[in-house]
Amino acid sequence: MGLNDIHSLSHTKWNCKYHIVFAPKYRRKVFYQNKKVEVGKILRQLCDWKGVNIIEAEVCPDHIHMLVEIPPKISVSSFMGYLKGKSSTMLYEQFGELKYKYRSREFWCKGYYVDTVGKNTSRIAEYIKNQLKEDELGEQLTMTGMGPYKSKR
């Protein structure tokens, strides 16, 4: 933890970093090409509006990893409610076809994963950077060796 990691509000010094993971409802693989780029822009814009700093982020086809600094005046749960609520509205505005896939107008899964980041910020940032590669490798491993004429052993 360096001096650059400590921020201040009036009468408060803080260093609040979180690793957050959330996914579209039904874990659908929707983030490809222009949707991947646009959801990144939307999340960046929403974080800027709330004063949340994105240290590292990766948009995978079926989930999103973010390493963020959230000021202590904002709770993680209220930030995630805001982020998921506003981003789903903005995604529906840009990509009208999503309304038909998600009829209940709930784009994101109900929950999310959050973990506090202590002194291992760089390690978690590296993990998030490599997440897309890991997902692709995992998909390749599950697809190899399977076929209609091969046993599951």
State where each predicted segment sits.
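Basic nucleic-acid-binding interfaces
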Residues: 1-153
